[in-house]
Amino acid sequence: MTWHPHANRLKTFLLLVGMSAMIVFFGALFGRTALILAVLFAVGMNVYVYFNSDKLALRAMHAQPVSELQAPAMYRIVRELAASAHQPMPRLYISDTAAPNAFATGRNPRNAAVCCTTGILALLNERELRAVLGHELSHVYNRDILISCIAGALASVITALANMAMWAGMFGGKRDGQNPFALLLVSLLGPIAATVVRMAVSRSREYQADESGAVLTGDPLALASALRKISGGVQLAPLPPEPQLASQAHLMIANPFRAGERIGSLFSTHPPIEDRIRRLEQMARG
């Protein structure tokens, strides 16, 4: 079984560089003061998210902590995988919902939490559950919460500067010698471009977690089988498309909403399931 993590890492790095380049461009329009204010706002907001990501996600899913007596298989699998990776044991939670999904959150391995829904526990066999938990632990070990917050901070800066461009275009463009139509165009396209790049970062991290999770468990075909089941299960029992749940959808192992409720692929937080399965099957073939 071969694993090529560097391609996804390079892609993530280049996407973050691209977002930084957008910020430099916007900063050139408004000068240093506006750029500093936007950066301070975005960093402050995302620092809060970084340190509270576990609480926000667990609360949104109404997740409850479980003991080893309540979830013996889940505890045994996670303990074995954590020991294999030489990492601490995370806190385990279960969300009482029929929607088949799982997620991990927490800013580092010592503050990590892993949550499974009752739907996914009922749907998967133990081999598939092990593969899913390996995927989720890989998100923690790869520091994906930190990467997500960096991408979020950069996107927030771009959005804040784009809003400034909009107001400048409407009220101050001609007076300041700037083209108001150009400013309004930038204000419209900037947030869209930032969102597209941010979602691309999220999709890149999903591929990375698929690969590193498959290496951790040594069983890429089990993860492929689990993803196939989860994809079908979501169509039967999706999460309700509520804003609080939508804000946490990027943490899930698969898009938790029914196909008709998804937005375009450029704005999706997850790669197509079929593509993920194909990559895992290629890994298994070596």
Curated annotation (Swiss-Prot):
Protein's name according to its UniProt entry: Protease HtpX homolog
GO process terms (BP): proteolysis
Superkingdom in the source lineage: Bacteria
Any single Gene Ontology cellular-component annotation: plasma membrane
Membrane topology note: Multi-pass membrane protein
Cofactor(s) in the UniProt record: Zn(2+)
MF GO annotations: metalloendopeptidase activity; zinc ion binding
Family, as annotated: Belongs to the peptidase M48B family.
Active site, renumbered: E136
Pfam families: Peptidase_M48
Keyword terms of this UniProt record: Cell membrane, Hydrolase, Membrane, Metal-binding, Metalloprotease, Protease, Transmembrane, Transmembrane helix, Zinc
UniProt-annotated location(s): Cell membrane
